[in-house]
Regions:
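Short beta-strand-to-loop acidic/aromatic patch adjacent to the donor-nucleotide binding site
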Residues: 52-62
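A conserved hydrophobic helix/loop-capping motif in glycosyltransferases and polysaccharide synthases
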Residues: 3-14, 75
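Short, well-formed alpha-helical segments that are part of the catalytic scaffolds
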Residues: 11-26
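Conserved donor NDP-sugar-binding/catalytic core segment of glycosyltransferases
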Residues: 62, 66-117
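A short, conserved alpha-helix in the catalytic core of glycosyltransferases
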Residues: 72, 141-142, 147-156, 160-165, ...
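A recurrent flexible, glycine/aromatic-enriched loop bordering the glycosyltransferase active site
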Residues: 116-156
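Active-site-adjacent helix/loop segment of glycosyltransferases
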Residues: 90-95, 99-104, 144, 180-246
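Active-site nucleotide-sugar/metal-binding loop of Leloir-type enzymes
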Residues: 42-53
């Protein structure tokens, strides 16, 4: 099975730098002209490659080290039972000791809401929305099964996509569609693994700049839809299970 790397984007001027950073990869870039949101752009592009696995690479990501994508493919081959793999995403920012803050080491649930292992930093103003930020000390260096993973730095097998189909059309714009998609895949019998391949991620750089009051309301409605659909199911619970090396 071949894999297609996809990167939807909004701002033309930033893609040249992205192409330079990931020059060795054959990436499908496509501009979100209609502003349908990143989720529906993922779907639009992956439907253009119906026989390929998909790797979602955001426009605000950068490589952590050389050879990272080959390492991702090794994990994909090593764990055939997993339908989706999430990379370890780091903010391009460090603490005083030089350790990077973790943006996402997999998805979990906190107070009935989707949350990340990590996150909490707002790079635009160095503000925070969590009481404590988590730094990368190697605590996520193992392969772990998680409840869901964010659709960025994410490898999705074609059979996972074929099983779930398109995104639930009742969701709007973006945010929480990826959570719903992951839970739907798990309901269909797939596993989601978090792997210790690091990428830098600014986090929602495009979405933050085009967000307005109407989109904030869409996010709120999406959360309500997600909770109505899944909150009483066994899948709407944090999962953090270490997987043995093969």
């Amino acid at each position: 099975m071949s894999v297609k790397i996809i990167t939807p984007y909004v701002f033309e001027e930033e893609i040249k730098e992205h192409q330079e950073l990931f020059w060795e990869l054959n990436i499908h870039y496509e501009k979100d002209i209609a502003r349908i949101g990143s989720d529906l752009m993922f779907q639009k592009i992956w439907n253009q490659y119906p026989k390929d696995d998909i790797f979602i690479l955001h426009a605000d990501m950068s490589p952590h080290h050389e050879g990272w994508f080959e390492e991702v493919l090794e994990y994909v081959e090593q764990y055939p039972e997993a339908g989706m793999f999430g990379c370890l995403l780091l903010y391009p920012a460090t603490d005083k000791s030089g350790k990077h803050y973790i943006q996402c080491a997999g998805g979990k649930f906190t107070d009935e809401r989707p949350d990340h292992f990590g996150s909490g930093l707002v790079l635009e103003n160095r503000g925070t929305f969590k009481s404590e930020l988590e730094v990368d000390t190697g605590q996520y260096n193992s392969t772990r099964e998680v409840a869901w993973t964010t659709f960025g730095g994410c490898y999705i097998r074609r059979k996972f996509i074929d099983s779930v189909g398109n995104f639930d059309p009742s969701f709007e714009w973006t945010y929480n569609r990826d959570v719903d998609y992951c839970l739907s895949g798990r309901q269909n019998g797939f596993h989601i693994y978090q792997i210790p391949i690091r990428l830098f991620h600014h986090e929602s750089k495009d979405n933050k700049r085009i967000k307005d009051e109407s989109k904030i309301k869409m996010e709120t409605r999406n959360l309500a839809r997600l909770q109505t659909k899944w909150a009483n199911s066994k899948f709407y619970k944090t999962l953090d299970k270490e997987i043995k090396n093969r």
